[in-house]
Amino acid sequence: MNYINKVMLVGRCGQEPDLKFFESGAVKASISIAVRPPYRSEQALWFDLVAWGNQAEVIGNYVRKGTQIAITGEFGFDRWADKNSGTMRQKPVITINTIELLGSPRKEESTSTSAPNETQAVANANF
């Protein structure tokens, strides 16, 4: 039996990309996106995304908070040991396979200098 693990999302980036460069030359970008349901009264759904290599470089160069993107990727989990207790932790994450830039940040989002808001806190919450 074959299995399919494919995710397709269109949403707006919720934060500036977090880029990491490794000694091996690998590049990793981490972002979150908000996907708004068709009915405005419903709250947006937040997804944590990671990208490697060329996709990470595209994200670092062109994606900013508020940029609308479309991605395809694979669902998985980041796993790590808690530094204090040694307990294994995990959070859901989507690894990007393809990314398409759909639009620039909205004016009010790109010029905002306010403190982090509730949506940023939700985007960074551990599940």
Curated annotation (Swiss-Prot):
Taxonomic lineage of the native organism: Bacteria, Bacillati, Cyanobacteriota, Cyanophyceae, Nostocales
Database matches in InterPro entries: NA-bd_OB-fold, Primosome_PriB/ssb, ssDNA-bd
Name of the protein in its database record: Single-stranded DNA-binding protein 2
GO-annotated cellular components: nucleoid
Keywords linked to the UniProt accession: DNA-binding, Plasmid
SUPFAM superfamilies named among the record's database cross-references: Nucleic acid-binding proteins (SSF50249)
Residues covered by region (Disordered): 104-127
Annotated ranges, domain SSB: 4-103
Compositionally biased spans, kind Polar residues: 111-127
Listed HAMAP family: SSB
GO MF assignments: single-stranded DNA binding
GO biological process: DNA replication
Pfam families noted in UniProt: SSB
This protein's encoding gene: ssb2
Subunit structure, as described in the record: Homotetramer.
NCBIfam families in alphabetical order: ssb
Bridged cysteine pairs (disulfide): none
Top-level taxon: Bacteria
